[in-house]
Design a protein with these regions (language model features):
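Mg2+/Mn2+-dependent nuclease catalytic core
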Residues: 66-163
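Walker A/P-loop
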Residues: 216-238
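A contiguous, basic/glycine-rich beta-loop/short-helix subdomain that forms a polymer-engagement track
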Residues: 332-357, 368-374, 477-592, 600-604, ...
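Conserved pre-motif I regulatory segment
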Residues: 182-224
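Signature of the SF2 helicase/ATPase Hel1-core->accessory helical subdomain module
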Residues: 235, 241, 262, 339-356, ...
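A substrate-engagement module of RecA-like helicase motors
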Residues: 187-188, 194, 247-357, 365, ...
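Conserved RecA-like P-loop NTPase helicase motor core
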Residues: 589-600, 651-762
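Metal-dependent nuclease catalytic cores that hydrolyze phosphodiester bonds in DNA/RNA
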Residues: 1-87
Length: 797
């Protein structure tokens, strides 16, 4: 007797199903997409409150889950209906609310088939659960600029609703079969997958074990893993094993820079090379500007053939790319050209079918551009956060916003002569900036003025935000009427986005923020500054099952657990896998590089660096806390040490200039080279100069951020909230830069090199306690002759 075939079981969000099958038309980013989730949620709540007054039994955000069978597939469909109520004639109504910036004239009953489909599925689930013979489906559209409400209704029997859902499932069935077959093969392969190297590196097995446990059990892990452990493989391999065993995922590998995305891609490539039949899909999400196929990026159907008719062609393109296990930027561009679809959107759409998604922090943490398709609700996601020491700073930026007086004044000038509601609205905003400039000048006159003309407010400016809200309608109307991309359109469109960004931050403004007003000449700059992003980060991490935050520098763990929003995380710190004797570690203890001592320090700094370089011919880097200090030291060093080739980091270097700088660090140099750079800059982390391409670094000072009004606000805030203002605002961020800079030397077990710390503060307990265990052999030096002897001894050993 033949064994019965077990049904294929698949769970799908209703919205994902209907948008995939029924969305039509083109990509048009003129106004769609910007903060739609937040703005839509606000409008939803407003309309739901109004509906409750009209219908006493109106229930908002009703969670629905229904099981539907189609052939051998059992679908579980789930989602939240915006509203369900009983109409005056006794018929139950499902209300689906949508916000749109499209002109009201375009909003017809046939405006968006996917909206009807979504409401129909909800109605079918509700009718089946409550044994109703009929239901009504209502679409409620809110046109955001005119604040106009339009409603459309359709009546269905329970049988008709069931047939509509079955038609959707019949269309989706081939995709469901493919997804389930892939997942089954993937899990089997991952369970059998072996570690791709003959042996683990020192510390690597311990790290992988910690990562596996947190992925299996759920929770948060903070892992300090020094250079050489192989961090990318140490997190990806156990996360993938957990995916195979627990059937969780997808895995999000989140990075601060493109170079670390490459490290993740390389680790996956090694796994695929070791297991050629491995079923594993990955996609690398690349910024729109970098992956766009057009010379000028304008995402409208009129300007871009890849945007025009995108939704008619995307399913064919997706079916094709599902055969490709590794979707990089280049691969996405290739398939996008083949199918005439946008490569950026193709990457986003393919992410729903991927096992590993590699991308920037902002795809999870940025409230504007995070992946709504995943993060509207909680999932079994695994978040791997590389270079996590960068996360608090990046998160502060994501939750801050700034506007300048000039942008409003110039916009008004570009509009030319004559009166209009838009020019009037711009004038009113400009007037507030003028008032702020007067206040900044008055307050500065009453203080010492060492930080310039600036002042802070602990609360948002309700008046200013109200004027910006009033500005949006005429500004949006002007943009609707003037779509040619000339200078005026470009400036006003950017202003529109900047205003919307400001208002989004204003909606979250609380005691974690300050408002800073700064005047300089006729310019005035207003900035809403997020001082503490930990609550926002905690909310983001709560969307997933597990999170691993890892970096070579996460000390002290308590600080990073706090600011990264993972106070309950398990923290582990692994020892360096390299022999301690390969690194000469010295501290020049007879000099202060504090700001007030900078001029006096230059001679000893120069002597120390020159002694380091002369001890052995090779390539070296010297890191300074600021450009100004670096320029001073560079000029003096070149004058006094002409036999040593010197280069320096320039401000705002492009990729070509950075590459040219690093290209001078050649293996086996015949003449010494000393590069001058800034701590925390482009050469202070993420630079991998192996072997003898770099044999020493000099680090001038403990890297404390420059004292300024913002940094002092951070200090005051963390003193009040944590009792550790100086540590949080200055000492911890500074020492992280020091440790990152020191990590540029000794990149492999065979490397040998010197780290020279130049400042007497490095000897103090408050700084020593932040140094890693493998720095226990730090030797204090108090004169040049002693340094010469110690360097000679180190290189001779």
């Amino acid at each position: 007797m033949q064994e019965p075939v077990s049904p294929i079981q698949i769970t799908l969000p209703v919205r994902q199903l209907v948008e995939f099958l029924r969305r039509a038309g083109s990509i048009d980013n003129r106004f769609t997409g910007f903060d739609r989730a937040n703005e839509g949620a606000r409008i939803h709540r407003k309309l739901q409150r109004a509906a409750v007054k009209e219908h006493a039994d109106y229930a908002a955000e009703v969670f629905l889950r229904g099981i539907f069978a189609y052939e051998e597939i059992e679908f579980t469909l789930e989602g939240r209906a915006d509203g369900i109520f009983t109409a005056a004639d006794g018929v139950t109504v499902v209300d689906e609310i949508k916000t749109t910036a499209c002109p009201a004239a375009d909003i017809t009953p046939d405006f968006a088939p996917e909206h009807w489909a979504q409401a129909i599925v909800y109605a079918a689930i509700y009718a089946a659960q409550h044994e109703l013979e009929e239901m009504r489906v209502q679409l409620t559209y809110f046109q955001v600029d005119e604040e106009l409400i339009l409603r459309f209704e359709r009546h269905y029997t329970a049988q008709q609703l069931q047939e509509e859902v079955e038609a959707l499932l019949a269309e989706y069935a081939p995709w469901a079969r493919r997804a389930v077959e892939w997942k089954k093969a993937r899990n089997s392969d991952l369970q059998a997958m072996q570690f791709p190297f003959p042996a683990y590196r020192p510390g690597q097995r311990a790290m992988a074990g910690e990562v596996y446990k947190v992925c299996r059990d759920g929770g948060r892990l903070l892992c300090q893993a020094p250079t050489g452990i192989g961090k990318s493989m140490s997190v990806l391999f156990p996360a993938l094993k957990s995916m195979g065993n627990e059937s969780v995922g997808p895995i999000f590998y989140l990075t601060a820079r493109g170079t670390t995305r490459t490290a993740a891609e390389n680790a996956l490539a090694i796994l695929r090379d070791t297991e050629p039949e491995l079923h594993l899909r990955s996609v690398t999400l690349t910024a729109k500007d970098k992956i766009c196929l057009c010379e000028t990026r304008e995402c409208t159907p009129e300007a871009c053939p890849y945007a025009n008719g995108y939704y008619a062609r995307i399913k064919g393109a997706l079916w094709d790319v599902l055969d490709v296990p590794c979707l990089t930027a280049e691969t996405l561009q290739e398939y996008a050209e083949r199918h005439t679809v946008c490569p950026f959107e193709l990457g986003l759409d393919s992410s729903l079918w991927s096992d590993v998604i590699i991308g920037d922090y902002n795809y999870l943490f940025d409230p504007v551009v995070h992946l709504v398709r995943f993060f509207e609700s909680v999932g079994d996601y695994i978040f791997l956060v590389d270079e996590a020491h960068n996360l608090p700073g990046r998160a502060r930026e994501m939750h801050s916003a700034a506007l300048t007086k000039t942008s409003f004044y110039e916009a008004k000038k570009l509009l030319g002569k004559g009166k209009s509601s838009l020019k009037n609205a711009l004038t009113k905003v400009n007037d507030v900036f003028i008032e702020w400039r007067h206040r900044a000048e008055e307050e500065t006159a009453a203080r010492d003025g060492r930080f310039g003309k600036t002042f802070f407010l602990k609360e948002r400016s309700e008046e200013f935000d109200h004027l910006l809200n009033r500005l949006c309608e005429p500004l949006k109307a002007w943009l609707d009427d003037h779509r040619e991309p000339d200078e005026t359109h470009t400036a006003l469109l950017q202003l529109y986005f900047d205003v919307r960004a400001w208002l989004r931050v204003a909606d979250t403004f609380d005691d974690h923020f300050v408002l800073q007003i700064t005047a300089s000449g006729s310019e005035v700059r207003a900035a809403q500054l997020c001082l503490d992003p930990s609550a926002f980060l905690a909310d983001s991490f709560a969307l997933g099952r597990a999170a691993v935050l890892f970096s070579a520098t996460l000390a002290p763990a308590s600080y990073y657990k706090d600011l990264c929003g993972v106070p309950e995380a398990r923290a582990v710190a692994l020892r360096s896998p390299f022999p301690a004797g390969n690194q000469g570690l010295f501290c020049i203890g007879n000099v202060s590089t504090r700001y007030k001592d900078r001029d006096a320090s230059l001679a000893i700094v120069e002597e120390s660096l020159a002694t380091m370089v002369r001890a052995r011919c090779g390539n070296y880097l010297a890191f300074f806390p600021s450009y100004a200090y670096m320029e001073q030291a560079y000029a003096q060093f070149k004058e006094h040490c002409p036999e040593i080739n010197c280069i320096k980091q320039e401000n705002a270097m492009d990729e070509q200039q950075k590459a040219a700088f690093l290209a001078q660090f050649v293996p086996g140099p015949r003449h010494p080279l000393l590069g001058f750079a800034v701590m925390g800059g482009v050469f202070g982390e993420g630079v991998d100069l192996t072997g003898d391409r770099l044999i020493g670094v000099g680090i001038v000072g403990p890297g404390l951020p420059q004292v300024g009004p913002r940094q002092e606000q951070l200090r005051d805030y963390f003193e009040q909230t944590r009792g550790s203002g100086f540590d949080y605002a200055y000492r911890y961020p500074g020492m992280n830069k020091v440790l990152q800079a020191a990590g540029r030397v000794i990149r492999t077990p065979r490397d040998k090199g010197v780290v020279l710390l130049i400042d007497n503060r490095f000897a103090m307990p408050d700084y020593r306690r932040l140094m890693p265990p493998h720095w226990s052999h730090l030797k204090m030096i108090y004169d040049t002759e002693e340094l010469e002897r110690e360097l000679w001894r180190f290189w001779e050993e």
